[in-house]
Structure formats: structure tokens, C-alpha cells
């Protein structure tokens, strides 16, 4: 049985996915905004790292676990993006939207499996599944993961500085 805190964390996790989809939709509606698959990945990894911080999941541990499972190939083969074998047939944002849909489908399948097997369906496993699917998307789209995380950290740093400046201005 899951605690209320775990249920709230799962609710927040799925809310995060919805907010990613909403952010991408809003940017697509803005005529002045140019959006590519790369920006979609930055948005997603930014939200994922912020969620991890919020629920006290060590994002580095997720990265390490992924690296280890990638070496041993012992992880479950996430449906991921095998169905999106030719990424160039679609526009990048369309492909990324399909990737988010696949993440949701993978999470639903994992939740169903957990109900049958008694495995734990918690925020850590959800974060890992989403992370693994996003990394698989990076690999198939030939996007440098290190650059994405660098951009995420720069974004978070500049937002943190901006928030601090606003806070200082309000206190003066």
C-alpha cells in the first residue's frame, strides 16, 4: 500500500508530464517561437530534474542506474521509440510528441504489470522509465545528452539568478 506522500508524488509526476505537453503546445501556438526537438528535450529534462529535486530523488543516481543498465542491457526493453525508426519522416516536434505518448504508454504498461506482479509503482521507477525513454530518444535522434544537460543547468542557473534578483528588488 502506498502512502499519501507517494501518491502525491506520483500525482505530481504525471502533472509534470502534462505541464511539459502544455508548455510545448503553448510554444507551438506562439508565432514568434521556433521550437525543435532539441528544445523539447531541454524542457523535458529541465522538468524532470526539477521534479527530482522536489521529491528528493538524486538525479545522478538515475543517470548512474541508467548507465549500469545500459552496459549490462539488463533493463526491460522500453517500448520507447522503436516504432519511430525514421525520425526524418516527421517534424521534430511531432516526433517528440509521439515520444511523450510512448513514455505515457510505457508507464501505463509498467503500472499494469506492477498490479499483477506486486512490483512497486513509485515515482523513482517512473522517473527512471521517463529518463530511459528520453535517453533512447536522444540516441535515435543523434542528440548529445551532455549538451542538453548543460543547457538545462544553464537555464536553471539563469532562472535562479533571475528569481533572486526579483526577490532582492521586492525586499528593497
Role assignments for model-derived ranges:
Residues 5, 45, 51-54, 59, ...:
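Intrinsically disordered, low-complexity repeat/linker tracts enriched for polar/charged residues
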Residues 5-8, 39, 50, 56-58, ...:
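Asparagine/serine/threonine-enriched low-complexity, disordered tracts
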Residues 9-22, 92-106:
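Short amphipathic alpha-helical heptad-repeat segments
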Residues 28-39, 63, 114-122, 142:
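Charged, low-complexity interaction regions
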Residues 40-51, 96-99, 123-137, 141:
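An amphipathic alpha-helical micro-motif enriched in hydrophobic residues
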Residues 58-95, 110:
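Long, low-complexity or tandemly repetitive, helically biased scaffold regions used
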Residues 164-172:
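Short acidic DE-rich linear segments
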Amino acid at each position: 500500500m502506498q502512502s499519501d506522500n507517494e501518491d502525491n508524488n506520483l500525482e505530481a509526476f504525471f502533472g509534470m508530464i502534462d505541464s511539459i505537453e502544455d508548455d510545448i503546445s503553448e510554444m507551438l501556438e506562439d508565432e514568434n517561437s521556433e521550437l525543435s526537438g532539441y528544445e523539447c528535450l531541454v524542457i523535458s529534462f529541465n522538468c524532470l530534474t526539477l521534479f527530482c529535486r522536489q521529491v528528493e530523488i538524486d538525479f545522478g543516481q538515475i543517470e548512474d542506474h541508467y548507465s549500469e543498465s545500459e552496459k549490462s542491457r539488463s533493463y526491460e526493453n522500453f517500448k520507447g521509440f522503436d516504432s519511430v525508426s525514421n525520425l526524418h519522416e516527421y517534424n521534430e516536434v511531432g516526433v517528440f510528441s509521439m515520444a511523450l505518448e510512448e513514455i505515457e504508454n510505457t508507464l501505463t504498461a509498467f503500472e499494469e504489470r506492477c498490479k499483477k506482479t506486486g512490483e512497486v509503482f513509485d515515482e523513482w521507477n517512473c522517473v527512471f522509465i521517463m529518463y530511459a525513454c528520453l535517453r533512447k530518444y536522444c540516441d535515435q535522434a543523434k542528440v548529445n545528452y551532455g549538451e542538453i544537460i548543460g543547457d538545462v543547468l544553464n537555464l536553471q542557473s539563469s532562472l535562479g539568478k533571475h528569481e533572486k534578483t526579483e526577490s532582492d528588488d521586492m525586499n528593497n
